[in-house]
A protein has these predicted regions:
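Sec-dependent N-terminal signal peptides of Gram-positive bacterial secreted proteins and lipoproteins
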Residues: 4-24, 406-425
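Active-site-adjacent loops and short helices of periplasmic peptidoglycan-processing enzymes
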Residues: 22-176, 180-189
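Domain-terminus/edge residues, biased toward the C-terminal soluble/receptor-binding domains
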Residues: 155-156, 169-172, 176-410, 421-427, ...
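Ubiquitous "structural anchor" signal
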Residues: 18, 74, 247, 316, ...
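Residues in and immediately flanking transmembrane alpha helices
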Residues: 15-16, 76, 206
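Hydrophobic alpha-helical segments and their boundary regions
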Residues: 10, 33, 95, 139, ...
Length: 439
C-alpha cells in the first residue's frame, strides 16, 4: 500500500509541477489577447499557453458544450426528432439584444435545424431549445447537465449559468477547460460534422413560420476569399459580448497534426484574427509529427479484491504512447509514472493510468498526459478465482453453508468482473482505434 501511495504522490507532484506558475511558457507572448491554450486534439496534451486557467467570460463559445451534450443525447439519430419551442426559450432573452433566429413559442423545430442554427447562426433561442432537449424539459436542467459534464471532465475553472453565453457573473470558463470541452465534444456522434460545416444551411418553413431561414458560418478565418483565411482551420466557434470581448475556439489540422486552439478576451476582432494566426503558425512550425514513445518498462503491482477477500495481484505497466514533441525534443525528454488506486475492486472499471510528462525545457510547455495503462494477469486471475470459488454441489453443515454462500458470492462477482473486464478492454481498444494518431 505504501508503494502505491508513494507512486500516486509522485504523479500528483508531477502534475502540479506541469502547471506551476514558474513553468516555462513555450508559446508566443500575446498582448492584445488575455489568454490562450493550444492542445493536441488526440491526447489533450498542453502544447502552449498563456493564462490558460484564468476564469473569463466565454460568450458564445459556451455553445460547444451545449451542442456536445445535444449530440451525445441524440447519438447520431437526428432525423424525425422535433422539438417544441417553449415560452422561456424565447422570452428569457427579452432585452438582451442577443443573436437569435426568431423562434416562436409553440414552433416545432427539427433537431437538425436547431443544431445548425445554434452552431452557425449562434442562435441563443436555439441553444435554449437544445438545453431543454438534453435537460429533461427545462433550460435549468440543461444548465445543470452542462455543469455536471464539466465536473465529469475534471474541469476546475468552469461554471455555466446559461446554455448560450450571455454574460453573467456566475458564468465562466478558462482556455484550458474550453479546449478540453471541445476535445470531448468531438467524440460525440455527429459533432465534428456539425462543427466543421462551411456550406450554407437551409432551414425550411415550420408549423408557425412560413419563411425559409438560411444560416452561414461566420468565421472569416474559414472563408477562402477573406484576407484572414487560415486553411488549416477545420471548424470553429466564435463568441463576443461587451464584457467577454472576443473569444474563439477551433480545430485545426496540418500534415496530420490536429490541434485545438482557444483564445479569450481579445480586445478587437482583428486582434483575434492576427493572434490565432500567430499561434497556429508557431504551433505547426514546432510540432511537425508524432513521436513514438515506446513502453519504458515501468511496472507496479495492483491488489485485486472481490467478495470481501483478496484474490491476488496483477501487473500494471506503461503501454507506450504517441506524443507531439517540439523539434529538438526526443523520447529521452519524456518520463513516465503510474497512477494506481490502492486496490482494484471487481465490478469497477480498473482506473489505472500511465502518466507521461514532457520536460520541454524552453521549447515546449512542461505538461503531462494520462493514458490507460496496460494490465496483465487479470483475466487469468479472474478465471482461476472463478474456478476455485465454484465447487461442485455437496452436503454441507451450517458453517459450510455460510462458506459456500461466500464462495458463490465471490464467484458471481468474479464472473461479472470477467464480463466487465471484456467490456473495458473493448472500450479501451475502441477509444484507441477512434483517436487519430497521425505521422
Amino acid at each position: 500500500m505504501k508503494k502505491h501511495i508513494a507512486m500516486l504522490c509522485a504523479v500528483l507532484l508531477t502534475a502540479l509541477a506541469a502547471f506551476a506558475p514558474g513553468a516555462a511558457a513555450a508559446g508566443p507572448a500575446l498582448t492584445a489577447t488575455e489568454a490562450y491554450c493550444i492542445i493536441d486534439a488526440d491526447t489533450g496534451l498542453v502544447l502552449a499557453q498563456q493564462n490558460m486557467n484564468e476564469e473569463l467570460h466565454p460568450a458564445s463559445i459556451t455553445k460547444v458544450m451545449t451542442l456536445g451534450l445535444a449530440c451525445e443525447k441524440a447519438q447520431g439519430k437526428w432525423d424525425n426528432v422535433k422539438l417544441t419551442v417553449s415560452h422561456e426559450d424565447v422570452y428569457s432573452l427579452a432585452g438582451t439584444d442577443s443573436s437569435h433566429i426568431a423562434l416562436q413559442e409553440g414552433e416545432e423545430v427539427p433537431l437538425t435545424d436547431a443544431l445548425y442554427a445554434t452552431m452557425m447562426a449562434s442562435a441563443n433561442d436555439g441553444a435554449n431549445l437544445l438545453a431543454e432537449y438534453f435537460g429533461g424539459g427545462s433550460i435549468e436542467g440543461g444548465v445543470a447537465a452542462m455543469n455536471a459534464q464539466a465536473k465529469e471532465l475534471g474541469l476546475e475553472h468552469t461554471h455555466f449559468a446559461n446554455p448560450h453565453g450571455i454574460s453573467d457573473e456566475d458564468h465562466y470558463t478558462s482556455c484550458y477547460d474550453m479546449a478540453q470541452i471541445l476535445r470531448w465534444a468531438l467524440t460525440q456522434p455527429g459533432f465534428e460534422t456539425l462543427f466543421t460545416r462551411n456550406e450554407m444551411y437551409t432551414m425550411g418553413p415550420t408549423n408557425v413560420q412560413p419563411v425559409t431561414r438560411y444560416f452561414h458560418q461566420q468565421d472569416k478565418m474559414r472563408v477562402g476569399s477573406s484576407r484572414y483565411y487560415i486553411p488549416a482551420i477545420l471548424g470553429s466557434k466564435i463568441g463576443y459580448t461587451n464584457i467577454a470581448r472576443y473569444s474563439y475556439v477551433c480545430l485545426a489540422e496540418q500534415n496530420g497534426v490536429r490541434l485545438i486552439c482557444v483564445t479569450m478576451q481579445s480586445q478587437i476582432k482583428t486582434d483575434k484574427y492576427n493572434d490565432v494566426r500567430t499561434l497556429l503558425d508557431d504551433a505547426f512550425a514546432r510540432y511537425t509529427g508524432y513521436t513514438e514513445i515506446p513502453a519504458q518498462g515501468v511496472t507496479g503491482e495492483l491488489e485485486v479484491a472481490g467478495g470481501g477477500s483478496t484474490l491476488g495481484t496483477v501487473t500494471v505497466s506503461d503501454p507506450g504512447v504517441k506524443l507531439l514533441l517540439a523539434d529538438g525534443l526526443t523520447a529521452a525528454d519524456v518520463s513516465v509514472t503510474l497512477e494506481l488506486p490502492e486496490q482494484y475492486l471487481l465490478g469497477v472499471d480498473p482506473a489505472v493510468y500511465a502518466v507521461y510528462t514532457i520536460h520541454g525545457r524552453d521549447v515546449q510547455e512542461t505538461a503531462s498526459v494520462r493514458v490507460p495503462a496496460a494490465v496483465t494477469g487479470l483475466e487469468e486471475l479472474l478465471a482461476k478465482s472463478a474456478n476455485a470459488t465454484l465447487p461442485a454441489s455437496r452436503d454441507v453443515g451450517p458453517k459450510r453453508i455460510a462458506g459456500g454462500l461466500l464462495a458463490i458470492s465471490v464467484g458471481a462477482t468474479v464472473l461479472a468482473a470477467l464480463a466487465a473486464f471484456g467490456v473495458v478492454r473493448l472500450r479501451i481498444k475502441w477509444k484507441k482505434g477512434k483517436s487519430r494518431s497521425k505521422h
